[in-house]
């Protein structure tokens, strides 16, 4: 069970985009995340008349290491750590370490 999942709001805690917030768009198998508006890179693309795409410089999000982000806790308005808890019915859920509240509602 991954600590950070697609759709979570995260804060970058290390690197050139430190302090930025964004939503996780994709979680890769190698432990990297694609976060909206974070780690923007420029790609030079060729025009492709078959697909109808124009060439030029395209700015897009690049993957960032999961260790460089922390989940955002809206209750405390701060980045937080994630723990796991097993409920009475045997279901394993994610909780915020600081408040012990469930991440998934």
Curated annotation (Swiss-Prot):
**GO BP term (any one):** translation
Q: Which organism is it from?
A: Hahella chejuensis (strain KCTC 2396)
General function of this protein? One of two assembly initiator proteins, it binds directly to the 5'-end of the 23S rRNA, where it nucleates assembly of the 50S subunit.
**Stretches assigned to coiled coil:** none
Instruction: Please give the name of this protein.
Output: Large ribosomal subunit protein uL24
In the record, the note on similarity to other proteins reads: Belongs to the universal ribosomal protein uL24 family.
Q: Which PANTHER family match?
A: MITOCHONDRIAL RIBOSOMAL PROTEIN L24
- Entry's Gene Ontology cellular component terms: ribonucleoprotein complex; ribosome
A GO MF annotation of the entry reads: structural constituent of ribosome
Question: Which keywords does the record carry?
Answer: Ribonucleoprotein, Ribosomal protein, RNA-binding, rRNA-binding
Which Pfam families did the record assign?
KOW, ribosomal_L24
């Amino acid at each position: 069970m991954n600590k950070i999942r697609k759709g979570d709001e995260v804060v970058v805690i290390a690197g050139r985009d430190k302090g930025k917030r964004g939503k996780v768009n994709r979680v890769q198998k190698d432990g990297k995340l694609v976060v909206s508006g974070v780690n923007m890179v420029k790609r030079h693309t060729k025009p492709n008349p078959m697909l109808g795409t124009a060439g030029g410089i395209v700015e897009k999000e690049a993957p960032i290491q999961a260790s460089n982000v922390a989940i955002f806790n809206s209750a405390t308005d701060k980045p937080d750590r994630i723990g796991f808890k097993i409920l009475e019915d045997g279901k394993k859920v994610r909780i915020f370490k600081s408040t012990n509240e469930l991440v998934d509602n």
